[in-house]
UniProtKB/Swiss-Prot annotation:
PTM sites of type N-acetylalanine: A2
GO CC aspect terms: cytosol; proteasome accessory complex
Note on domains (UniProt): Rich in dileucine repeats, which have been implicated in trafficking of a variety of transmembrane proteins.
Name of encoding gene: PSMD5
Name of the featured protein: 26S proteasome non-ATPase regulatory subunit 5
Species whose genome carries this gene: Bos taurus
């Protein structure tokens, strides 16, 4: 079959308008194994196919792109980089986005190959065209270009090619296209900066990181909202956080939050700024961040009082992030009755808010209540106290939510049960709640895969607890172990009895 494909390819190269042959070749290639094509790689002459892309014929272009996608997979990245460099350059400037995406996918293969990537680094014109793809209208083209440039920058040679040549001027030129393209370049810069201190140094020397930070703390509230997301990504790395602290950026963000009350447009950027501190706290030390920037916690508590669901959602998410480790839980516990009142509000929202906000509340509560296996009496007393602050009967609250006909809500409620399943006080509550043990064992409640998986995780957490046999009793413990061994998707066989004479 590969021989047939080669014959058709030769036929295509002879003809001026080979539409029928292209259709036949595309159809044939779908059934030719890639291994066979690789054996014939030396015979693949792709130049004519690339030439056909230059004609303004939509179907012909579509067919050629489809054929090239298949045939190029049979060629080694080094071969593509060395022998098709002119075709790649043309492809990046082609008016049809599918041709650009095809070309960029090959660039992606090349930059992943340590032998082939050198060919691209030595091709200034090709690099320039990749940079200019960031400025295109098609988001897929831009994203693929960003990914390729980010991959190129993983080596010292790649960093030098990007930041110590005319390419930096091209990057700055592309940024001037419009606001959207400027943010795409910032996205690339943050991706590169996050790799290592050396990468960050190259990006700061270029002036682009400074420009991003200047926009973050500038007067345009919409720009602030966009820039804080990128700065939060940079803060995900230790060297990124160090840099932001040294440059005084974290203090500036804190000061902007302090002044937010006097800004009628603060709702545009405040959620992102609060998220920034939430992520910062969990990656460094919740206690240190909350002590150094008290406005952060103050604002989170304030946002839970808001009438704006967006503000409430961000506050709830942040509480969940902060309470995801023991130190963060202890920071929240130190706020005393204020946190208990906040929990009551979360309990109310979990019952009465929109489905989306209910799920966010349940996810936050799962994070807050979860304790690692090394539990102390103090931590257990704390989570039990928190649980009782949610409502008059929190266990029934979550059972009620889990019975609603929405799989996402059902799974989120099961996650809360799973979070407390290894804590003795919760096991006693479950055991003493009428019908709860049967509810856990009942497989007929869950109908979709996600729900079955979530129920299985709950059963696993209970069955693996050291205290469960004593609290639930041995018969129930054995039922849990049976459920566990049968797996999440077990269906009990229905026994049928044959009756003589029945039709």
């Amino acid at each position: 079959m590969a021989a047939q494909a080669l014959a058709l390819l030769r036929e295509v190269s002879r003809l001026e308008a080979p539409l029928e042959e292209l259709r036949a070749l595309q159809s044939l290639l779908q059934s030719v194994p890639l291994s066979e094509l690789r054996e014939q790689a030396a015979e693949l002459r792709l130049g004519p196919l690339f030439s056909l892309l230059n004609e303004n014929h939509r179907e012909q272009t579509t067919l050629c792109v489809s054929i090239l996608e298949r045939l190029l997979q049979a060629l080694e990245p080094v071969h593509v980089a060395r022998n098709l460099r002119v075709d790649l350059q043309r492809g990046l400037t082609h008016p049809n986005d599918s041709v650009k995406i095809l070309t960029l996918s090959q660039v992606g293969r090349i930059v992943e190959n340590s032998d082939a990537v050198t060919e691209i680094l030595n091709n200034a014109e090709l690099l320039k065209q990749i940079v200019y793809c960031i400025g295109g209208e098609n988001l897929s083209v831009a994203k693929t270009a960003i990914k390729s440039l980010s991959r190129i920058s993983l080596t010292q040679a790649g960093l030098e090619a990007l930041f110590e040549s005319n390419l930096l001027d091209d990057l700055k030129s592309v940024m001037k296209t419009n606001d959207i393209v400027r943010y795409r370049v910032y996205e690339l810069i943050v991706e590169i900066s996050s790799v290592s201190p050396e990468s960050l140094n190259c990006c700061t020397t270029s002036g682009l990181v400074t420009q991003l930070l200047r926009e973050l703390t500038g007067e345009d509230v919409l720009v602030r909202a966009t820039c804080i997301e990128m700065v939060t990504s940079l803060a995900c790395t230790h060297h990124g956080r160090q840099y932001l602290a040294q440059e005084g950026v974290i203090d500036q963000i804190s000061n902007i939050i302090v002044g937010a009350d006097a800004d009628p447009f603060s709702s545009f950027y405040l959620p992102g700024f609060v998220k920034f501190f939430g992520n910062l706290a969990i990656m460094d030390s919740p206690q240190q961040i909350c002590e150094r920037y008290p406005i952060f916690m103050e604002k989170v508590f304030e946002m839970t009082e808001s009438q704006d669901p967006t503000m409430i959602g961000v506050a709830v998410d942040t509480i969940g992030i902060l309470g995801s480790n023991v130190e963060g839980k202890q920071v929240l516990q130190k706020t005393g009755t204020r946190f208990e009142r906040l929990l009551m509000k979360i309990g109310y929202q979990a019952k009465n808010a929109s489905t989306e906000l209910k799920i966010r509340c349940l996810d936050a509560l799962s994070s807050l209540f979860y304790l690692p296996p090394e539990q102390t009496d103090d931590l257990l007393r704390m989570t039990e106290s928190w649980f009782s602050s949610l409502s008059r009967d929190p266990l029934e609250l979550f059972r009620g939510i889990s019975n609603q006909p929405f799989p996402e809500l059902h799974c989120a409620a099961l996650k809360v049960f799973t979070a407390i399943a290894n804590q003795p006080w919760a096991q006693k509550l479950m055991f003493n709640s009428p019908g709860f043990v049967e509810y856990v064992m009942d497989r007929s409640v869950e109908h979709d895969k996600a729900s079955k998986d979530a129920k299985y995780e709950l059963v696993k957490a209970l069955a693996n607890s050291k205290t469960i046999a004593e609290i639930f009793g041995n018969p129930n413990y054995l039922r849990l172990r049976t459920y566990l061994s049968e797996g999440p998707y077990y269906v009990k066989p229905i026994s049928t009895t044959a009756v003589e004479g029945a039709e």
